Amino acid sequence: MAIPQLDPYQKAQETRRRVLELAVFMKREDGGNASSRPRGTAQPGQAVDMFLALLQDRLPVWLRILDDLMHLVGKGRVSDNLLPIARAGIDYYSEVQSAAVPVFTSPSVTVRFREALRDSELGPMAEVVPLTEYLAAEQRAGRIPPEVDPLASARLLLAGCLRHAYYEMFVGADFLPSRDDSAEEIVRELRLDLQRA
């Protein structure tokens, strides 16, 4: 959920604090147990640490980018405003997903992470809400067709970004459109701009 009435710096700090709480929860639940993996291979705890450190660094920036959309209501074309969001989303998911994969190979870590994510309110709605609010504000301003569902459109934009990052991680960037081209395609296919007669 969005953090009400905080300036952007405070919001970023609050997000970092929540990620740290998430990390503390994960460590407490882990109990500091060492794995019996062969020497030279990554320990499960190391993967969790790396993922949470990356999340602590990247998530506040990503949420701030989404929150800053509200400053663009009524300015420029809606699709032009969303294009850098889609590109930033692809970049964010590409970085975070690659660090997340080794973390979620353990079912128990996955369950603990889900619990911690719910408790910290850093789940998917943390990014869906600001994007939905922007689209709803543009719709109220008459710049998005009335039949558009802002929540569904926000989810579709984010899903398109996540999909590109996912495919890029598994098949490689050479087999996909560029990140810029994918961002353009994602935004274009939402068809949010009003068509002029």
What is the predicted function of each stretch?
Residues 55-85:
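Amphipathic alpha-helical linker/stalk segments
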Residues 80, 91-103, 111-141, 151-155:
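Amphipathic alpha-helical packing segments from all-alpha helical-bundle domains
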Residues 20, 27-30, 36-37, 47-62:
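Amphipathic alpha-helical segments enriched in hydrophobic/aromatic and basic residues
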Residues 57-61, 88-92, 96, 160-167, ...:
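Phosphate/oxyanion-binding loops and surfaces in catalytic or ligand/nucleic-acid-binding neighborhoods
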Residues 1-31, 42, 48-49:
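Basic, helix-initiating cap at the start of DNA-binding domains
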Residues 9, 16-17, 37, 48, ...:
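Short, structured helix-loop boundary elements
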Residues 125, 139-187:
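Hydrophobic/aromatic-rich alpha-helical bundle segments in the mid-to-C-terminal region
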